[in-house]
């Protein structure tokens, strides 16, 4: 075999040109203390706040306390086998979760890993869990509605796309039920949904997932789960993970709805982490930055303008706005809305829906207290027909509450007062609604029209529900074109009013209920 020196030299030159020296410099440290899911690490000189630290066994911790001679980190997962002297490494990365359409219809944990047994997720990339919220210039005012399907909410406390509307109340007052119904109502609206369950029982979450599947809403929803048995770090980070998944749709010119169920448990998990990290406690033993914990999360829910979407998608999507609407849930103790976390979240959000135990126990469900519930920006987003018709509903209920309290002391009431009481009690009865039965815009409009125009006057109180059901069935069969028009346009004019009136007059004259 003859060796050609020219060929050999060319080959050597080629190899030298292609040769790459790759050196990976990663800081290494040693665990010096482990307790309650918190590890203290010595020797990590080059670590960022919030950086992922690699532990043995494909686990990670997140650096939260950067001190002079050590780093305090919280372990994301089991920590029983970690001991003093174990070596750990920095990664140079902050926590990221998978995002994309492949997550729709799936149940994932805080890290975006599937826990529903349906195989791997086909994601469109990764997104950091902590992102700075869009600035003032990048936002657009809220002017499109999110229909929850609840008469009491859509008529009196309307929610717009990009709004943050708090659902607040004691335990067992229907907070989760309201949020789940809002998700079910988005089945055909094009709004993608994210449901974040923090610190709940696994059986409760399984029931929610089953209900979403039964009503055809799971295919449109991402469920992010951090159960009560999981590490405090995972419960604290779950809302941020869910938010990153929702922002994927917002930033691409679509609309998304996210439910945080609930932020009280997230605050408790964060308090636990902070106390274990020896951070100084403040009011109710919460750390000083618990307001920032929720404000930086809820500020990410917004409606962004066309320029933002166009810039983000590099021109792939033009002329479309995107939105992320948030429904945070807060659980109060014995109706105390002046506690630390409830007042914080009330001040951050654009309104709140108060659910009361007394109303719930009296059979008024949803147990919304219209007197202290408010939507600060949703009025601009309300559909035209509901806005026109619902003006008198809130007034009627407010007057009824006032007069009902007064009438307990007054024996003889004049006719006008008695009429107001009669009207108020019927409107209150009309606001009742079954769970998992969200109503369309047209159905709500017909019911409210009947109340506003005095058609409930001669109806017995215990027959109001039957009257409404029979009326909606009649209108759907006899005035299907009108119902379709209202659902599609949400418009209200003299022609629509005349047809609604004619339909109701004929129904009252000819039908029984």
Swiss-Prot record:
InterPro entries: ATP_synth_asu-like_sf (IPR023366), ATP_synth_asu_C (IPR000793), ATP_synth_asu_C_sf (IPR038376), ATP_synth_F1_a_nt-bd_dom (IPR033732), ATP_synth_F1_asu (IPR005294), ATPase_a/bsu_AS (IPR020003), ATPase_F1/V1/A1_a/bsu_N (IPR004100), ATPase_F1/V1/A1_a/bsu_N_sf (IPR036121). The keyword Glycoprotein does not apply. It is found in: Cell inner membrane. One of its GO terms (molecular function) is proton-transporting ATP synthase activity, rotational mechanism. The record marks 373 as: Required for activity. GO terms for cellular component: plasma membrane; proton-transporting ATP synthase complex. ATP binds at residues 169-176. It is a peripheral membrane protein. Keywords: ATP synthesis, ATP-binding, Cell inner membrane, Cell membrane, CF(1), Hydrogen ion transport, Ion transport, Membrane, Nucleotide-binding, Translocase, Transport. Its EC number is 7.1.2.2. It catalyses: ATP + H2O + 4 H(+)(in) = ADP + phosphate + 5 H(+)(out). Pfam families: ATP-synt_ab, ATP-synt_ab_C, ATP-synt_ab_N. Belongs to the ATPase alpha/beta chains family. Produces ATP from ADP in the presence of a proton gradient across the membrane. The alpha chain is a regulatory subunit. F-type ATPases have 2 components, CF(1) - the catalytic core - and CF(0) - the membrane proton channel. CF(1) has five subunits: alpha(3), beta(3), gamma(1), delta(1), epsilon(1). CF(0) has three main subunits: a(1), b(2) and c(9-12). The alpha and beta chains form an alternating ring which encloses part of the gamma chain. CF(1) is attached to CF(0) by a central stalk formed by the gamma and epsilon chains, while a peripheral stalk is formed by the delta and b chains. This is ATP synthase subunit alpha. It comes from Shewanella sp. (strain MR-4). The gene is atpA.
């Amino acid at each position: 075999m003859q060796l050609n020196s020219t060929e050999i030299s060319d080959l050597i030159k080629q190899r030298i040109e292609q040769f790459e020296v790759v050196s990976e410099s990663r800081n290494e440290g040693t665990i010096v203390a482990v307790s309650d899911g918190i590890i203290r690490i010595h020797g990590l000189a080059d670590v960022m706040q919030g950086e992922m630290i690699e532990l043995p066994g494909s686990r990670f911790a997140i650096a939260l306390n950067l001190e002079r001679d050590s780093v305090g980190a919280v372990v994301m997962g089991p920590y029983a086998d970690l001991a003093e002297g174990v070596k750990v490494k920095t990664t140079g990365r902050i926590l990221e979760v998978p995002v994309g359409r492949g997550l729709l219809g799936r149940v994932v944990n805080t890290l975006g890993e599937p826990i529903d047994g349906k195989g791997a997720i086909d994601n469109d990339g990764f997104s950091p869990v902590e992102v700075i919220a869009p600035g003032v210039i990048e936002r657009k005012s809220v002017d499109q509605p999110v229909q929850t399907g609840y008469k009491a909410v859509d008529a009196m406390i309307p929610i717009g796309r990009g709004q943050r509307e708090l659902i607040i109340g004691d335990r067992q007052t229907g907070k989760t039920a309201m949020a789940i119904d809002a998700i079910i109502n988005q089945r055909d609206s094009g709004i993608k949904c994210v449901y974040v369950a923090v610190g709940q029982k696994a059986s409760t979450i399984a029931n929610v997932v089953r209900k979403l599947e039964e009503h055809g809403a799971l295919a449109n929803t991402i469920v992010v789960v951090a159960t009560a048995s999981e590490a405090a770090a995972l419960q604290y980070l779950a809302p941020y993970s869910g938010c990153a998944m929702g922002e994927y749709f917002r930033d691409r010119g679509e609309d998304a709805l996210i439910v945080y169920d609930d932020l009280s448990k997230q605050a408790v998990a964060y308090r636990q982490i902070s106390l274990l990290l020896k951070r100084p406690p403040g009011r109710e033993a919460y750390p000083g930055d618990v307001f920032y914990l929720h404000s930086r999360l809820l500020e990410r829910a917004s409606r962004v303008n066309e320029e933002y979407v166009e810039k983000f998608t590099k021109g792939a999507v033009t002329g479309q706005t995107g939105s992320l609407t948030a429904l945070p849930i807060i659980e109060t103790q014995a109706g105390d809305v002046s506690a630390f976390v409830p007042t914080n979240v009330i001040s951050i959000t654009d309104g709140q829906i108060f659910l009361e135990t007394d109303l719930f126990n009296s059979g008024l469900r949803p147990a919304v207290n219209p007197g202290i519930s408010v939507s600060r920006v949703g009025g601009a987003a309300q559909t035209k027909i509901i806005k026109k018709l619902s003006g008198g509903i809130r007034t009627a209920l407010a007057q009824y509450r006032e007069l009902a309290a007064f009438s307990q002391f007054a024996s003889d009431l004049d006719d006008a007062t008695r009429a107001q009481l009669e009207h108020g009690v019927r409107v209150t009865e009309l606001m009742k609604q079954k769970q998992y039965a969200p109503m369309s815009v047209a159905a709500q409009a017909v019911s409210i029209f009947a109340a506003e125009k005095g058609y409930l006057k001669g109806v017995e109180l215990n027959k109001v529900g039957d009257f409404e059901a029979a009326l909606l069935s009649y209108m759907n069969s006899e005035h299907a074109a009108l119902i379709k028009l209202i659902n599609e346009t949400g418009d209200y004019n003299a022609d629509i009013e005349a047809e609604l009136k004619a339909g109701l007059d004929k129904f009252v004259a000819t039908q029984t209920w």
